[in-house]
């Protein structure tokens, strides 16, 4: 069974019907292999598959943080639809990353112009930081 088929089979256990021809892999993570793919409705998904059994237990604080932020900030946060020992899955966020990690060169590859950084990037980052700092203390 190919890795793509394994990913499809794993996702189907959670009623995610990822189209095989849409799957692409990101091997840069140490703890998770990440696959991107579209379901039959055209929704793009992020599928995180743990590389080792010990990884799952460390996802609980991450899940708590994601859930907390969704209730307390206005910027886009992943909405985990699956949080299981063999898969974390959520619809892909809009936009594009500023940079990605290339495992071959073991460094970042910029996806945006970064010399200098665009004003929109700086403004968006500043708005995000303000949003985080405005979380009421009683919510923390």
Task: Outline where the language-model segments fall.
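Juxta-kinase regulatory segment immediately upstream of eukaryotic protein kinase catalytic domains
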Residues: 1-23
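ATP-binding pocket architecture of kinase catalytic cores
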Residues: 22-140
């Amino acid at each position: 069974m190919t890795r793509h088929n394994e990913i499809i089979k794993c996702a189907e256990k959670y009623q995610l019907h990822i189209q095989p021809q849409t799957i692409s892999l990101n091997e840069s993570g140490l703890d998770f292999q990440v696959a991107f793919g579209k379901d039959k409705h055209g929704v793009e998904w992020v599928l995180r598959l743990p590389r080792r059994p010990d990884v799952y237990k460390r996802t609980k604080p991450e899940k708590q943080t994601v859930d907390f932020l969704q209730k307390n900030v206005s910027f886009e946060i992943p909405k985990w639809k699956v949080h299981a020992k063999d898969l974390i899955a959520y619809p892909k966020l809009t936009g594009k990353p500023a940079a990605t990690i290339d495992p071959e060169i073991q460094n970042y590859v910029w996806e945006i112009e970064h010399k200098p950084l665009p004003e929109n990037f700086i403004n968006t980052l500043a708005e995000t930081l303000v949003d985080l700092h405005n979380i009421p203390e009683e919510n923390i």
